[in-house]
């Protein structure tokens, strides 16, 4: 969600800070700000409502000169989007930027008011600034003041604090919201995402839960939740500096849709050969864990949850292991029964999704045999805190609407299903070879699906004046319909819903009329005849049908029904394949609607607070 960048250097850092914010724009925000300690040890601050570009222009008009600074993009939680509520917030010589939610901010606000502090904003973050200023009255150490302040906070935070009286120091604290340190030569950096710092370093330390860090130009000191000095592993990033550039594409989402063949190759590389899935590639000790598994519990949010729903069909039909899938924000707040020898699987693009991370921590207390995460970001909290980590290697995904993260999660899940089925003796050698062959053909098949972009773009014109849409699917294509409806509503703002096609008679049929487009995913499989019956129900009521099917399904266009004839692919990987035309449809409808494709309103890429 919000973005943080900090720097301590010999050189002026304002440009580094603002460039970092530009790289974090994909996370979603409504205002931005930057503060620098100048050469006279004075705090200078500029904030603005709107885009980072406006902040950049303001700094160009009134340059900020200094080697220590912090910057922030805000996504409003407490207080409306405004310049006054934008970060950094200050108190005397202090400035602070903060991601997260301070749950006891009202209580602390009243306490600080009683001590004479005047609040200028509606935010919970201003409480932190005043609290640190108060604690600094009894110490000359910024680190100690921050330590005392955070002990009084309840909630989630990733924060960076600076004090103009200590001009070469930044102090950061992490509890429930990610922070990463970037290591330079004679300079060091902080950010909420390593992507912000790729132009200045490739060496990173990911702060762990409860860590507090003090950085100067030449030193980095980290203290754990008990106050003891801690050593944290240094990670060398292999992300490209231009990973957050659109290149020849109009939008990041479009770029990421077209990157999927390569992303899938990267996901599979070194994990499958011509005949089988390499079980050990899932992680050290994976085979021993899989041999004992009797149940799978998948926990995820949003698009990742939809990937888990597809995987449930695979786990049960291919591997013969029962599987439950639950939304993380529901899972963590209900009383549940842990099944014997149950493997917990978390899915998250960022590895920092707040509810999923909290669900993992809860599950550790509930007797799950092990926790495996399928994730795209190395060094993230889910990766560090899970027993096994299966990295999707999708590369940086900037568009808020997830595309390649979804398909690579599905590929990773299918490899896991195959490995589990093989270990459990439920998948034969011949079946494994069939799955491997189908997976290896996927990148080329997806290239064929991408070739339908012109046809789908023309189809999208039909949605120009539409305000509602209905998606239908059966079996493993029901969650693909759910994912398609999510994409359409996210980026085009069309109210879209998805149903298992067999549920039409149980309510949704009442919505069907000539103004309701109905998109059906209907490849030729064992459920096709059932889907055809559902299609006839829609036709009989004048609904406008858009059917995505292969030639073998036998559909012919007619009045009120358009057919998009896709190539035939293996049934096992067909859910991944049919995701592509759904993504293209959503993208082109959003273009026609004129919405902000990469940064849709009210949404953020990484949901790092509840």
UniProtKB/Swiss-Prot annotation:
GO biological process: carbohydrate metabolic process; fructose 6-phosphate metabolic process; protein N-linked glycosylation; UDP-N-acetylglucosamine metabolic process
UniProt keyword terms in alphabetical order: Aminotransferase, Cytoplasm, Glutamine amidotransferase, Repeat, Transferase
Pfam family, one: SIS
SIS domain sequence ranges: 278-426, 459-600
The reaction(s) this protein catalyses: D-fructose 6-phosphate + L-glutamine = D-glucosamine 6-phosphate + L-glutamate
Entries under PROSITE patterns matching the protein: GATASE_TYPE_2 (PS51278), SIS (PS51464)
InterPro entries on file: GATase_2_dom, GFAT, GFAT_N, GlmS/AgaS_SIS, GlmS/FrlB_SIS, Ntn_hydrolases_N, SIS_dom, SIS_dom_sf
CDD domains registered for this protein in UniProt: GFAT (cd00714), SIS_GlmS_GlmD_1 (cd05008), SIS_GlmS_GlmD_2 (cd05009)
GO CC terms in record: cytosol
SUPFAM superfamilies documented for this protein: N-terminal nucleophile aminohydrolases (Ntn hydrolases), SIS domain
Cell compartments where the protein resides: Cytoplasm
GO molecular function: carbohydrate derivative binding; glutamine-fructose-6-phosphate transaminase (isomerizing) activity
EC primary class: transferase
TM region positions: none
Enzyme Commission designation: 2.6.1.16
Active-site residues per Swiss-Prot or TrEMBL entry: 2 (nucleophile), 605 (for fru-6p isomerization activity)
Ranges where the Glutamine amidotransferase type-2 domain occurs: 2-218
Subunit structure of this chain's protein: Homodimer.
Role summary: Catalyzes the first step in hexosamine metabolism, converting fructose-6P into glucosamine-6P using glutamine as a nitrogen source.
PANTHER family: GLUCOSAMINE--FRUCTOSE-6-PHOSPHATE AMINOTRANSFERASE, ISOMERIZING, GLUTAMINE--FRUCTOSE-6-PHOSPHATE TRANSAMINASE (ISOMERIZING)
Name of the protein: Glutamine--fructose-6-phosphate aminotransferase [isomerizing]
Gene it is expressed from: glmS
């Amino acid at each position: 969600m919000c973005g943080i960048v900090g720097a301590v250097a010999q050189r002026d850092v304002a440009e580094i800070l603002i460039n970092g914010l530009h790289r974090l724009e994909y996370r979603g925000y409504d205002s931005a700000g930057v503060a620098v300690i100048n050469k006279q040890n004075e705090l200078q601050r500029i904030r603005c409502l709107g885009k980072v570009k406006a902040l950049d222009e303001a700094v160009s008009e009134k340059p900020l000169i200094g080697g220590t600074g912090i910057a922030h993009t805000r996504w409003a939680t407490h207080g409306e989007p405004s310049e006054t509520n934008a970060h950094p917030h200050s108190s005397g010589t202090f400035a602070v930027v903060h991601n997260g939610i301070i749950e006891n901010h009202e209580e602390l606000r009243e306490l600080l008011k009683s001590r004479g502090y005047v609040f200028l904003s509606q935010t919970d973050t201003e409480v932190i600034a005043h609290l640190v200023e108060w604690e600094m009255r009894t110490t000359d150490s910024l680190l100690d003041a921050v330590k005392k302040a955070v002990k009084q906070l309840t909630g989630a935070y990733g924060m960076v604090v600076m004090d103009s009286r200590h001009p070469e120091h930044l102090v950061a604290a992490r509890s429930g919201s990610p922070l990463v340190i970037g290591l330079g030569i004679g300079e060091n950096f902080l950010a909420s995402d390593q992507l912000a710092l790729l132009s200045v370093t490739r060496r990173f330390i990911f702060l762990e839960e409860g860590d507090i860090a003090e950085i100067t130009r030449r030193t980095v000191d980290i203290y754990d939740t008990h106050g003891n000095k801690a050593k944290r592993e240094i990670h060398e990033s292999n992300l490209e500096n231009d990973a957050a550039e659109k290149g020849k594409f109009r939008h990041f989402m479009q770029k990421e849709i077209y990157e999927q063949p390569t992303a899938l190759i990267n996901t599979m590389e070194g994990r499958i050969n011509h005949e089988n899935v390499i079980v050990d590639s899932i992680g050290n000790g994976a085979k021993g864990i899989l041999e004992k598994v009797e149940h799978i519990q998948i926990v995820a949010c949003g698009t990742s949850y939809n990937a888990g729903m597809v995987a449930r069909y695979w786990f049960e039909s291919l591997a013969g292991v029962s599987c439950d899938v639950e939304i993380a924000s529901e899972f963590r707040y209900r009383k549940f029964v842990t099944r014997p020898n149950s493997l917990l699987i978390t899915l998250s693009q960022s590895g920092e999704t707040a509810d999923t991370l909290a669900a993992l921590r809860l599950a550790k207390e509930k007797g799950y045999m092990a926790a495996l995460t399928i994730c795209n970001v190395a060094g993230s909290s889910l990766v560090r805190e899970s027993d096994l980590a299966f990295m999707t290697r999708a590369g940086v995904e900037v568009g808020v609407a997830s595309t390649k993260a979804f398909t690579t999660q599905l590929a990773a899940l299918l490899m896991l299903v195959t490995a589990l089925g093989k270990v459990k003796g439920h998948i034969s050698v011949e079946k494994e070879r069939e799955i491997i062959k189908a997976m290896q053909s996927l990148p080329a098949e997806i290239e064929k699906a991408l070739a339908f972009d012109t046809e789908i773009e023309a189809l999208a014109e039909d949605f120009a004046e539409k305000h509602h849409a209905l998606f239908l699917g059966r079996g493993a294509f029901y969650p693909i319909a759910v994912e398609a409806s999510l994409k359409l509503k996210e980026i085009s703002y069309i109210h879209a819903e998805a149903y298992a096609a067999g549920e039409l008679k149980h309510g949704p049929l009442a919505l069907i009329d000539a103004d309701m487009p109905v998109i059906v995913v209907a490849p030729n499989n064992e459920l096709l005849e059932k889907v055809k019956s559902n299609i006839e129900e829609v036709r009989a009521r004048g609904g406008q049908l858009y059917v995505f099917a292969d030639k073998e399904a036998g559909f012919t266009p007619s009045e009120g029904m358009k057919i998009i004839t896709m190539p035939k692919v293996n049934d096992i990987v067909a859910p991944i394949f049919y995701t592509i035309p759904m993504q293209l449809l959503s993208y082109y409808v959003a273009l026609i609607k004129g919405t902000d494709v990469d940064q849709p309103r009210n949404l953020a890429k990484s949901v790092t607070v509840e």
